[in-house]
Amino acid sequence: MSIPEMQWAQVAEQKGGPLIYKQIPVPKPGPDEILVKVRYSGVCHTDLHALKGDWPLPVKMPLVGGHEGAGVVVARGDLVTEFEIGDHAGLKWLNGSCLACEFCKQADEPLCPNASLSGYTVDGTFQQYAIGKATHASKLPKNVPLDAVAPVLCAGITVYKGLKESGVRPGQTVAIVGAGGGLGSLALQYAKAMGIRVVAIDGGEEKQAMCEQLGAEAYVDFTKTQDLVADVKAATPEGLGAHAVILLAVAEKPFQQAAEYVRSRGTVVAIGLPAGAFLRAPVFNTVVRMINIKGSYVGNRQDGVEAVDFFARGLIKAPFKTAPLQDLPKIFELMEQGKIAGRYVLEIPE
């Protein structure tokens, strides 16, 4: 398979951008790595944070962002046994980990202190050819469309793991904050596929229509409600609140409200990462109502296998729009304005 020396990529040369669409060298895989010809890459809010450099985590510069890449393996290192040339592969946020520390040994690879992160600490998938550790790349069934599966590689795995972390069971109710966004639209579907009832929280009629079409039993519009806490509780059985809350918002305020409408002995799971934000919960109520508050961060390798399997079996359809790689700056503008329903997937040029 012919591999060129140069390729097109979206490159940030300094924090805050601008993005420059230019040619850069094609990387060569190490002994335990694969080189993937990226056909599609989802766009995640994390990519915008990476560009801005506004998280308390050092970001590589210059940087090729992106961490939801789906494509074809075109080269592999001598030690790679998991992939053959021509296999379909997904490159995710967790590009690699040491596999030897306490966290890796107990299947918490995302917590590895030496983890490498696609599109953040190593170059990601907003380029024609990208590198990933073979042990962490996802093998994709060849009958699965690469454009449609791209958002599952981060958004899907992340929300699937969050639902597992919440402990919510079939027949119980989960409130999903940010249900009309890229993560939320997937969380809603995973929840429905797991037999969980959903109260969707977001803003706007377009997002309401999408959430209802995906199976939400109730929709609370934060731009219209006079009392969000009361409205969410009223939408749950017996008005007692949701058994779990999945926080996918990119603003701080929802993180201050969730403990007020979660059910006693319920669980609040923080997944969204608004820059500089803090969680807030009344200590008295948290104690006497036995509320659990926890974070959930992407997923391990097995979570990835399971999340992709839901998709491969037709249980999940990621709402997405396609755009060329050159349009990434415009997509970031729409993202900052909160005007994206579902997910954007970039088509990477051949």
From Swiss-Prot:
UniProt enzyme class: oxidoreductase
Entry-linked Pfam families: ADH_N, ADH_zinc_N
Keywords noted in UniProt: Cytoplasm, Metal-binding, NAD, Oxidoreductase, Zinc
Record keyword DNA-binding present: no
One Gene Ontology MF term: zinc ion binding
Matching InterPro entries: ADH-like_C, ADH-like_N, ADH_Zn_CS, GroES-like_sf, NAD(P)-bd_dom_sf, PKS_ER
Enzyme Commission no: 1.1.1.1
Catalytic reaction list: a primary alcohol + NAD(+) = an aldehyde + NADH + H(+); a secondary alcohol + NAD(+) = a ketone + NADH + H(+)
Binding site for Zn(2+) 2: C98, C101, C104, C112
Listed cofactors: Zn(2+)
Binding positions (NAD(+)): G178, A179, G180, G181, G182, L183, G184, D202, K207, I271, G272, L273, R343
Cofactor binding annotation: Binds 2 Zn(2+) ions per subunit.
Classification via Gene3D superfamilies: Medium-chain alcohol dehydrogenases, catalytic domain, NAD(P)-binding Rossmann-like Domain
Record's protein name: Alcohol dehydrogenase 1
Organism: Aspergillus flavus (strain ATCC 200026 / FGSC A1120 / IAM 13836 / NRRL 3357 / JCM 12722 / SRRC 167)
Origin organism lineage: Eukaryota, Fungi, Dikarya, Ascomycota, Pezizomycotina
Gene: adh1
